[in-house]
UniProtKB/Swiss-Prot annotation:
Keywords in alphabetical order: Cell membrane, Membrane, Repeat, Transmembrane, Transmembrane helix, Transport
Keyword match Membrane: yes
Record-level GO cellular component terms: plasma membrane
Family: Belongs to the AAE transporter (TC 2.A.81) family. YbjL subfamily.
The protein's name in its UniProt record: Putative transport protein CKO_02260
Transmembrane segments: 8-28, 32-52, 66-86, 94-114, 158-178, 383-403, 406-426, 447-467, 475-495, 540-560
Single Gene Ontology BP annotation: potassium ion transport
Organism: Citrobacter koseri (strain ATCC BAA-895 / CDC 4225-83 / SGSC4696)
Protein's UniProt keywords contain Endoplasmic reticulum: no
Location in or out of the cell: Cell membrane
Superkingdom as given in the UniProt entry: Bacteria
């Protein structure tokens, strides 16, 4: 039996789509030196090649892909978006605005200089910034711009072409810039990170290991009684001196949970909870009696929970003010916008931050009730909330404003982005509402993006040969300029206007470009995870601004003549 593969793929859109995805994902795993191509560029290259052979898919698949992607971007940004926008993220907001705004203006200028159409210009901006949200926002706005079908088809094809030609240029140039730009300025990044560490009491180890606290029991001997000198537990401050706290005491056969007024007596058996290294460093006074095994004394369930910051008595306060150790709990991690932050006593908590806390189950539950709620450990997605807010986003996108002879529609990209932000924000405030496991959210976002990339590549592939010959050299120059010049402008603004610490500044710059590979290079250069503070500060707001930049470039273009 003979099978005509071309006819088979042309006759089955679903089969063609998944063939493109599979081949593209395989290609995306290849590396050019230390740079991995990535899923987006892999799928785009394969789809462009097949598009040249006149393969195509239904445009509805493309539309659904970008809608799912941009909605999930909003959901991820939601928990921290408003806190960054309205309160303590002024510098980060300004940096993101400078980065995105300067890139937008430069792209508009180069597009007019080289005589490109809006499709090539917007695609070049998206590729140079390695930003799919720009591509999505521009594509959606073009479809609602009222262009004639022939003009729209050319603009959308050129949008894909511009993105494909400049994406690798943008990625590689930013990675090279992240490696060498810190060396061209007079402040050493490692020194800057250490300075912040000294000022704020941060843990700078990017590879810090996290251990569960353990419980051990000791019999109180004469040396410990003499050391206590009649002081109660509150006065002794045992945790501050040892890194352990007394969870239980057995005295005269009676088991009790001590309060701060308890005084240690000869013969008491005490259960100490702390990290393994804290037990190892215990003064001999604690162990001079004898370590004991008492099933009841040691019967404590140590748990590790992720607590979402929500309550007003925690939001806006410094981490040290929570006094977790006073409540018998140990902080393992602080996560903001999916970025692990350094353990910083002075970091100001935002609504939606996640604290990974270990300790006795009862104590952890008490702390969680005080500052927020324990994140649901469930694999079940609240599909009702997902679908409802998706519908709301589409309805918002239908809104059109009329100004004399000019009409402006919000569009699906902005509508879905706003609806996603609201769902993410509400989820951070209501533990039982709108829960989407992070793995499920990542899968839907990645799948939507890959479907979108496959669609734009197949639709643009037939014209890539002619386009590459006509504008290839111009695209190379423009891609480098739009990728690197805004980074330099952002550095100068942050260093000499905002006077930011260099470690935080470079992290924030990579966050404004939403480029994780470049962020890893900055952390390696600083030999610290302190730049993650800056990265998390700009990342959420930059994703939103980049989507709006894709919309704005299409709206502004006709007015430039």
């Amino acid at each position: 039996m003979n099978i005509n593969v071309a006819d088979l793929l042309n006759g089955n859109y679903i089969l063609l789509l998944f063939v493109v995805l599979a081949l593209g994902l395989c290609l995306g795993k290849l590396r050019l030196g230390s740079v991995q191509l990535g899923n987006s560029i892999g799928v785009l290259v394969v789809s462009l090649l097949l598009g040249q052979q006149h393969f195509s898919i239904n445009t509805d698949a493309l539309n659904l892909g970008f809608m799912l992607f941009i909605f999930c971007v909003g959901v991820e940004a939601g928990p921290n978006f408003f806190s960054i926008f309205f309160r303590d993220g002024k510098n980060y907001l300004m940096l993101a605005l400078v980065m995105v705004g300067s890139a937008l203006l430069i792209a508009l200028g180069l597009g007019k200089l080289f005589g490109w159409d809006i499709g090539l210009t917007a695609g070049m901006l998206a590729g140079s910034m390695t930003s799919t949200p720009v591509l999505v926002g521009a594509g959606d706005t073009l479809r609602h711009s009222g262009m004639e079908s022939s003009q729209l088809s050319v603009a959308l094809d050129n949008l894909s072409l511009g993105y494909a030609l400049t994406y690798l240029i943008g990625l590689v140039s930013l990675i090279v810039g992240a490696r060498y730009l810190p060396k061209l300025q007079h402040q050493d990044l490692q020194t800057s990170a250490q300075q912040i560490a000294r000022e704020r009491g941060l843990d700078t180890d990017a590879n810090r290991k996290v251990y569960l606290p353990v419980i051990r029991a000791y019999r109180v001997g004469p040396e410990l009684v003499a050391w206590a000198d009649g002081k109660n537990l509150r006065e002794l401050g045992i945790y501050r001196q040892t890194g352990c706290y007394i969870e239980r005491i057995r005295r005269n056969g009676i088991l009790a949970n001590p309060d701060g007024d308890a005084v240690l007596q000869m013969g008491d058996e005490i259960a100490l909870v702390g990290y393994p290294d804290a037990h190892a460093r215990l003064d001999p006074s604690f162990r001079n009696g004898k370590e004991v095994f008492d099933r009841d004394l040691l019967d404590m369930r140590i748990v590790t929970e992720e607590i979402v910051v929500k309550n007003h008595n925690a939001v806006g306060r410094r981490l040290a003010q929570l006094k977790l150790t006073d409540h018998g709990c140990f902080l393992n991690r602080v996560i903001r916008s999916q970025i692990e932050m350094p353990i910083d006593d002075n970091v100001v908590l935002n609504k939606g931050d996640v604290l990974q806390v270990s300790g006795d189950a009862r104590r952890v539950k008490t702390v969680a009730d005080r500052i927020g709620f324990i994140s649901i450990h469930s694999q079940v997605t609240d599909l009702l909330a997902f679908c409802a807010f998706f519908i709301i986003g589409l309805m918002i996108g239908m809104i059109t404003f009329q100004f004399s002879n000019f009409s402006f529609g919000i569009g699906n990209a902005a509508g879905l982005l706003f609806a996603g932000i609201m769902l993410g924000f509400l989820r951070a405030n209501h533990p039982t509402f709108g829960y989407i496991p992070q793995g499920a959210l990542n899968m839907v976002k990645e799948f939507g993006l890959m479907v979108f990339m496959a669609g734009v590549g197949l639709s643009a592939g037939s014209g890539i040969g002619n386009g590459l010959g006509a504008v290839g050299g111009q695209m190379l120059i423009a891609g480098l300029v739009v990728s690197l010049v805004p980074v330099i402008i952002c550095f100068l603004f942050g260093a000499y206007v905002l006077r930011m610490n260099r470690a935080l500044l470079f992290g924030a710059m990579m966050g404004a470009r939403t480029c994780a590979p470049a962020m890893e290079i900055i952390s390696d250069t600083a030999r610290s995870n302190i730049p993650a503070l800056g990265y998390a500060g700009t990342y959420a707001i930059a994703n939103v601004l980049l989507t709006l930049a894709g919309t704005l470039i299409v709206i502004i273009w006709p007015g430039l003549g």
